[in-house]
Amino acid sequence: MLIFEKSRKNRRTLAHAIADKMDANDIPANLLRHDAPRLPELSELEVVRHFTRLSTQNFSIDTHFYPLGSCTMKYNPRAANRLASLPGYLKRHPLSPAPQSQAFLQCLYELQTMLTEITGMEKISLTSMAGAQGEFAGVAMIKAYHESRGDYDRTEMIVPDAAHGTNPASAAMCGFTVKEISTTKDGDIDLEKLRQMAGAKTAGIMLTNPSTLGVFERQISEVAKIIHNAGGLLYYDGANLNAILGKYRPGDMGFDVMHLNLHKTFATPHGGGGPGAGPVAAGPRLSKFLPVPMVGKNKEGYDWLTEKECPKSIGRLSAFMGNSGVLLRAYIYLRLLGKEGLSRVAEFSTLNANYLMKRLEQLGFTLAFPNRRASHEFIITLKPLTRAYGVTALDIAKRLLDYGFHAPTIYFPLLVPECLLIEPTETESKQTLDHFIEAMEKILTEIKTTPDLLRNAPHQQLINRLDEVKAARELDLRWYPIAKETEIFIQ
């Protein structure tokens, strides 16, 4: 039931003093209301119960296993939230002078230092407010680099066919023409096609490594050589950095610039539309183009580095210093784990993914790349089951909800038909993985015996299967409900 439908006239949430009546003549006539505001009227208890009930109907990391591939839905330690909310940080005004913000600036400076070491880059800017914005900034830096050299003919950006959708979008927003490079049957970049494609118009290539196919790009050194010899640069999409923390650094692979998704790799909160953070790191060729502000250190302490100190910067991407609360959470996460802890993140995320992959293969599910070891995630294709029983990846995703699991990513990457992209993360126990395997085994039996059970799933949720075509074509969106075929507000 909607909160508007629970409304009853003259119910109030809080008792408060009645404000002094203002003479209506003091207010311009065009600003006066003619009708009561269309807001629900409920008691405080009714409001609390309503939103608490809604929260229990959500799937979240705090309540369910959430193997959403390419999203790294790991547990966010509560200690980071608690420490980042200390009054000294929480109540600091963005315009506070640097001498009064030394502790805050020290945290950001040390975060910069740790992230440059983790990535193998020269410098980093923390100001981007999301991974997509950081990605845009990195591509803009590549453009600024070529233009600073008078190389205006480099108008093409190479993007793999398995890339995240933000990759071609960022390239297009920066004015580049996107050139798609295909992937081989083993999940690697097609080097022969890359050699043919790279040339005088190539500005760079955008890669995720490990890729969204769940495998490591084994020929990355050769890819870097081909692009650099053609005069281009390498952009690293940090979406899958979790798999290689402390093991292999993007800078050592030959990448020139990258962004990091703090909400994935460094356990800051997901969802809700933000706040987020997508720091941008760069090697020697591009570090002078990083967005400002950054934090510097001198003999007097810590201070902001702005356009004055960084004249080649592409400029500002956000007001003040981006989402500093998110940055503090990532800083605390890194301090809690330390260098050895970060290496264990990569080890356990890879171990969990490979365990899950092998167990599902043993049950009879088809792996997209059966001859490859998984990185931190893997793909199964349901095409054989679709052909035999008419059950789709969407059907399995819906049925998993009935077993108490959030569905994996479905239909991505696009080049693998009827696929599930599964990422268990390092924070899940073997017992949780085994429960998921049991659910998948039961679903596999249902596919072969009662496929209609899946086609109509979910069966145990508040909202069952929707008519997705109708929902997309016949939108019915409003901020308040109305009675059918009338404009009468539900009261």
UniProtKB/Swiss-Prot annotation:
Its cofactor is pyridoxal 5'-phosphate. SUPFAM superfamilies: PLP-dependent transferases. Disulfide bonds: none annotated. GO terms for cellular component: cytosol; glycine cleavage complex. One of its GO terms (biological process) is glycine decarboxylation via glycine cleavage system. One of its GO terms (molecular function) is glycine binding. Coiled coil: none annotated. Its EC number is 1.4.4.2. It is an enzyme of class 1 (oxidoreductase). The modification N6-(pyridoxal phosphate)lysine is found at K264. Keywords: Oxidoreductase, Pyridoxal phosphate. It comes from the Bacteria. It catalyses: N(6)-[(R)-lipoyl]-L-lysyl-[glycine-cleavage complex H protein] + glycine + H(+) = N(6)-[(R)-S(8)-aminomethyldihydrolipoyl]-L-lysyl-[glycine-cleavage complex H protein] + CO2. The glycine cleavage system catalyzes the degradation of glycine. The P protein binds the alpha-amino group of glycine through its pyridoxal phosphate cofactor; CO(2) is released and the remaining methylamine moiety is then transferred to the lipoamide cofactor of the H protein. The glycine cleavage system is composed of four proteins: P, T, L and H. In this organism, the P 'protein' is a heterodimer of two subunits. Belongs to the GcvP family. C-terminal subunit subfamily. This is Probable glycine dehydrogenase (decarboxylating) subunit 2. It comes from Coxiella burnetii (strain RSA 493 / Nine Mile phase I). The lineage of its organism: Bacteria, Pseudomonadati, Pseudomonadota, Gammaproteobacteria, Legionellales. The gene is gcvPB.
